[in-house]
Amino acid sequence: MAEHGAPAPAIPNGGCAARLPGNKVTVVLGAQWGDEGKGKVVDLLAQDADIVCRCQGGNNAGHTVVVDSVEYDFHLLPSGIINPKVTAFIGNGVVIHLPGLFEETEKNLKKGKGLEGWEKRLVISDRAHIVFDFHQAADGIQEQQRQEQAGKNLGTTKKGIGPVYSSKAARSGLRMCDLVSDFDEFSERFKVLANQYKAIYPTLEIDIEGELKKLKAYMEKVKPMVKDGVYFMYEALHGPPKKILVEGANAALLDIDFGTYPFVTSSNCTVGGVCTGLGMPPQNVGEVYGVVKAYTTRVGIGAFPTEQDNEIGELLQMRGKEFGVTTGRKRRCGWLDLVQLRYAYMINGFTALALTKLDILDVFPEIKVGVAYKLDGEVIPHFPANHEVLSKVEVKYETLPGWDTDISNARTFDELPVNAQNYVRFIEMELGVPVKWIGVGKSRESMIQLF
């Protein structure tokens, strides 16, 4: 310690230099209300990745990946697991429904060879919380109550996501480490939690002993996959050079803090959720790619300023085959909203964008883009936090000429019609973020890379 007011040495302990930050992770996030095509971007990047991670959400997410003409659906697993060389990591911020996890693997194994050997390539954080069947049942009851009491529900996926994050925040939840450590102790805590739920929801039926029997069987299967997640990530970041990819679920406008509350999910699906959901510091975040559909869609209810509840919306819905992967619900469709995208950029600091489904706009003679919101005739400077205000905004549009050409066979930017190129450049200029990929179809080959 420095004496008599003398300055301390510049380097702590006189010679301990700061550690090198280690490997960077590449993050892929949804920039709208979900369903932007994140799985496709991840699939592209996962081809030479070493580790692919999920950091938040549960099996309420839905990612589709097409490999060798086989369409795989992922809800809980990182979709990058389709690469046989990849280690998939489910972080502590994810909530895990064990029956859902094994059902997902079985369904995908029947479709093709993409998931072979998955058990040896999956690591699950011991700090991840477990979704129980009664969480899912409670989710359904809560939705029913909202409908009866307020005349509208939140439109949840009924996958138990809200209730399990509630248990986590109330500190009554159970984690993977509890399941695989001492099953007797786990069983006692499970009974307490189940009885709490029965007290809150008298109509809820829980076969406690039956559930525990099933959970014990899952425990045997999952135990080899459960590891200390913090140590796993630290080793991955500070060991030999590795390409680490983080696959965000849901999207910016569904974030519990920054989304169109209350019509949101229950986790942080913006860039901050990467650090808290994996147990890693922000200096290890590298590229942050925002995935943007060339128009806008939303599942369920909630404000949607650029929605086209007309023939335009129907045409977008039909051409884009806009149905939710998890719920099968029709997606609401509308024009691209740059006010909303600027807001998503402010929170996430996207380093580049992936613009997907540009080919869906092929048939429109002119294309509108929302560039500002007005309230009582005045342009408002920010994306409103209040849902009622957002519901009332009037959108100011910029109209761009369409290209009336099938672009699905384009493989370079120069092969796109001039008006399609101008549409992409307009988005870049308005947002101040470069577009790195343009999607013009379903296959891997139909992602045009610009740089």
Swiss-Prot record:
IMP binds at D35, E36, G37, K38, N60, A61, G62, H63, T157, R171, N250, T265, R329. Mg(2+) binds at D35, G62. Inhibited competitively by AMP and IMP and non-competitively by fructose 1,6-bisphosphate. Its EC number is 6.3.4.4. Pathway: Purine metabolism; AMP biosynthesis via de novo pathway; AMP from IMP: step 1/2. The active site is at D35 (proton acceptor), H63 (proton donor). It is found in: Cytoplasm; Mitochondrion. Substrate binds at D35, V325, T326, T327, G328, R329, K330, R331. Its cofactor is Mg(2+). InterPro entries: Adenylosuccin_syn_GTP-bd, Adenylosuccin_syn_Lys_AS, Adenylosuccinate_synth_dom1, Adenylosuccinate_synth_dom2, Adenylosuccinate_synth_dom3, Adenylosuccinate_synthetase, AdSS_2_vert, P-loop_NTPase. GO terms for biological process: 'de novo' AMP biosynthetic process; IMP metabolic process. Binds 1 Mg(2+) ion per subunit. CDD domains: AdSS. It catalyses: IMP + L-aspartate + GTP = N(6)-(1,2-dicarboxyethyl)-AMP + GDP + phosphate + 2 H(+). The keyword Coiled coil does not apply. GO terms for molecular function: adenylosuccinate synthase activity; GTP binding; magnesium ion binding. One of its GO terms (cellular component) is cytoplasm. The keyword GTP-binding applies. Keywords: Cytoplasm, GTP-binding, Ligase, Magnesium, Metal-binding, Mitochondrion, Nucleotide-binding, Purine biosynthesis. GTP binds at residues 34-40, 62-64, 331, 357-359, 439-442. It is an enzyme of class 6 (ligase). Belongs to the adenylosuccinate synthetase family. Plays an important role in the de novo pathway and in the salvage pathway of purine nucleotide biosynthesis. Catalyzes the first committed step in the biosynthesis of AMP from IMP. Homodimer. This is Adenylosuccinate synthetase isozyme 2. It comes from Gallus gallus (Chicken). The lineage of its organism: Eukaryota, Metazoa, Chordata, Craniata, Vertebrata.
